[in-house]
């Protein structure tokens, strides 16, 4: 690649965690946005992961990890975990949020870049419900050399 004078860089927005709702399945999260680089010749895209899905009776499903296209190396993000231990999917540069505490159904936020959000926790055995937490935004890293 030579003489790239301009490029368009888009940083994918963080997906949101689903709400916990007493007496129902709660709400599903929102998928993360795509991060991309486009310079007129090359387009490289890291798609955001899919949202986790809320279901009735405690067990939600983790969302699929994001995919990548156009790079020399394209690494897919990890799938999020569901069930009693929900966890947002990890990326190469970030970690997904996680269900943190059984007693009060707390959830911990995602860290780094591209970490998946964690879904809300709904328990049939407790009046306490944990609210989902958002994921983290994507990142574009540019190395210039001559």
Where do the protein language model's features map onto the residues?
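Low-complexity, glycine/proline-biased repetitive segments and flexible coils/loops
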Residues: 1-146
